[in-house]
């Protein structure tokens, strides 16, 4: 959520930033108009309360003098009714302002490229060379079924479209990837591992920006009023919600592996086969909570943490900066890492790393103190995939397949696969 002082002090800047996202800048004028009404009502109620205090003193004086105070008491009641009416109006205006503010996205950083869609994202780095196959490579959705690593048909029977059973070596590979990523982040990148709730309340979803604007993308347990998490970013970032972090604690670096649940509203017809776009998938998430002056360096470091995994796994990828028309609601700047998938003959997103500046912190009321005597300030929050496990699984299957239908295990994963170096079709 944005600070209303930005609207008062720099309205044109806010308008231009909103317009860059393709949204209507008129909301700035709406906020300012309501803010002016709010100020007038506050002034009016303060005036009325001062008058009520004066009348209260007058009543006390009359009673001390044993004079008739009925007319003054009547005036006091009238003032009380007027104050109550103004307070109700003020509450209504406050709610209108908040309802607008919570739907306005974060302000985009100056170096984010302008563009209308993902086609205008800007590549800033490329690593590795896509493999030149001497045979026709298979798509991961075909190869995993041949190797008995996954069963999409039975998952559809049990749950519907966009679900999967991972079986035998498929389950082993998924677990190996999760353990490898968590080990890398905790032993080499300085993150603290967390195991988080995977059902959260509405306040938590509001804090990270999923609610109210993106409720259709979420799965909800209606009876309890809880939501399944779309990413571990949600519980990790909200760890300090409504708290003041004490001096010396920051920066906090959290990582967690969770199942993630997404309705994929608006994705009909896209990536309907395989592991790329499921309703339920595993992901290892990175979250950083830092002091404001450290957040831009933290974004670079976090992105490099995700890149280190792709490089150690030997998976070709590229880094792109998301343009103004593709960047997420809560982000001020986002890097996407896209891994090479032969079945698409293209790069597909495998990680998204964002600096949300103080946008989520204001929504979730997360503050810190620099020292014991200082005033609390809003933190900056960052999040990134480190990595999406299912998409990494798919990338390994496609990039490490062999002509005889077997699958070579990347060297970095062998210790996490119980020493297994190759996956072959099981006898039964």
From Swiss-Prot:
Keyword Aminoacyl-tRNA synthetase: yes
Pfam families reported in the protein's UniProt record: Seryl_tRNA_N (PF02403), tRNA-synt_2b (PF00587)
Gene Ontology CC, one term: cytoplasm
GO molecular function: ATP binding; catalytic activity, acting on a protein; serine-tRNA ligase activity; transferase activity
EC number(s) per entry: 6.1.1.11
Annotated positions binding ATP: 262-264, 349-352
Gene Ontology biological process terms in this record: selenocysteine biosynthetic process; seryl-tRNA aminoacylation
Signal peptide interval: none
Pathway in which this enzyme or protein is active: Aminoacyl-tRNA biosynthesis; selenocysteinyl-tRNA(Sec) biosynthesis; L-seryl-tRNA(Sec) from L-serine and tRNA(Sec): step 1/1
Binding site for L-serine: 231-233, 285, 385
Annotated keywords: Aminoacyl-tRNA synthetase, ATP-binding, Cytoplasm, Ligase, Nucleotide-binding, Protein biosynthesis
Record HAMAP family: Ser_tRNA_synth_type1
Similarity field: Belongs to the class-II aminoacyl-tRNA synthetase family. Type-1 seryl-tRNA synthetase subfamily.
NCBIfam families in alphabetical order: serS
Protein name per Swiss-Prot or TrEMBL: Serine--tRNA ligase
Organism in which the protein naturally occurs: Staphylococcus epidermidis (strain ATCC 35984 / DSM 28319 / BCRC 17069 / CCUG 31568 / BM 3577 / RP62A)
